[in-house]
């Protein structure tokens, strides 16, 4: 009996060791596995505006901290949002209180800081841009509308709606309805990770942010000439660069097929807290409706080359240390 108990104990100890350590490293990674991004357009716009307005103050409060505070206060339910709550928090910071003290009793403040930080890091910051009058440096909105300036479009907010092609699944993106050939620009600077055909998204591009937390997915691009000229996987793009053109490709196993009824850009945003999440059954895609509404005020002006019929951005734009 003693021998049996000894064997059982040894087996359990070995199993526990296998769970906790692999090559001396902790395998129980502590990273976020679920995010529901319910920040409203008004809340995001107010937070961005306050961030910019207070940037030069001694007690600057960034938009992510403000939204994380409200997320913890509301339990993530931004239908409860009141501008006065945001102003109250910003005023307390301005008057000398610390974020640590104001959030010490908020159990989930750190969670919302990480979640909203992953979703929004870099949306505002230092930038340098060319204009018709020269070059200017400032602090402000650094992300761009995915549709180039002067091209008409409308948004169709159906995140989570049912899609049935291939299999029944939720729609994990935001659709921007526009004419075929409308220039698509990078919302945020990053590296092109994927370019090519996908039976669902058609011709598509995937761009990863510099901090690796955000994977932007642009799908249903134009038939025959979907991508910006000479763009390839591994290239770095700047926010506002032309990366492709609106189309209606996809919903087909046959490459270069127009399987979508109405031309539009499918814009998706995946949050990545651990690389194991990137292509898995546990991917985190968030609703970018509020984000696209806020960044539409920052559209990239483009020019057309009449010989190649390609569009490129008119004015150079540099974010931070790009």
PLM regions and their residue ranges:
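Acidic, glycine-rich catalytic/binding loops that coordinate metals and/or anionic ligands
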Residues: 257-322
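Sec/Tat-exported extracytoplasmic proteins
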Residues: 180, 196, 241, 247-250, ...
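Active-site scaffold segments
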Residues: 175, 238-239, 244-245, 264-270
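Short hydrophobic beta/alpha edge segments that flank linear recognition/processing sites
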Residues: 204-207, 237-256
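Solvent-exposed coil/turn segments that connect beta secondary-structure elements
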Residues: 181, 210-212, 223, 270-274
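Cationic-aromatic interfacial patches
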Residues: 2-110
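Surface-exposed, glycine-biased beta-strand/turn segments
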Residues: 98-203, 239, 294-322
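Zn2+-dependent peptidoglycan hydrolase active-site motif and core
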Residues: 187-230, 254-262
């Amino acid at each position: 009996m003693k021998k049996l108990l000894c064997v059982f104990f040894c087996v359990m100890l070995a199993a526990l060791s296998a769970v906790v350590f692999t090559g001396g490293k902790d395998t129980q990674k502590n990273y976020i596995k679920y995010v529901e991004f319910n920040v409203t357009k008004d809340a995001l716009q107010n937070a961005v505006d306050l961030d910019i307005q207070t940037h030069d103050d001694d007690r600057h409060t960034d938009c992510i901290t403000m939204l994380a505070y409200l997320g913890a206060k509301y339990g993530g339910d931004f239908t409860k949002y009141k501008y006065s709550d945001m102003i109250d928090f910003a005023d307390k910071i301005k008057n000398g209180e610390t974020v640590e003290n104001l959030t010490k009793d908020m159990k989930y403040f750190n969670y919302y800081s990480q979640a909203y930080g992953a979703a929004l890091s870099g949306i505002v910051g230092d930038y340098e841009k060319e204009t018709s009058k020269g070059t200017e440096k400032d602090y402000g909105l650094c992300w761009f509308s995915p549709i180039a300036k002067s091209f008409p479009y409308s948004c169709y907010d159906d995140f989570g709606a049912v899609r049935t092609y291939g299999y029944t699944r939720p729609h994990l993106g935001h659709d921007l309805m526009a004419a075929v050939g409308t220039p698509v620009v990078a919302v945020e600077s990053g590296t092109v990770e994927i370019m090519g055909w996908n039976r669902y998204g058609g011709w598509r591009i995937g761009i990863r942010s510099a901090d690796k937390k955000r994977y932007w997915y642009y799908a249903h691009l134009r038939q025959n000439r979907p991508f910006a000229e000479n763009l390839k996987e591994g290239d770095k793009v700047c926010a506002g660069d032309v990366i492709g053109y609106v189309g209606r490709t996809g919903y087909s196993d046959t490459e270069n097929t127009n399987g979508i009824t109405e031309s539009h850009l499918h814009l998706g945003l995946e949050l990545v807290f651990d690389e194991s999440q990137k292509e898995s059954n546990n991917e985190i895609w968030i609703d970018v409706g509020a984000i696209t509404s806020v960044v539409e005020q920052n559209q990239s002006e483009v020019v057309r080359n009449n010989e190649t019929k390609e569009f490129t951005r008119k004015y150079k734009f540099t974010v931070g240390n790009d």
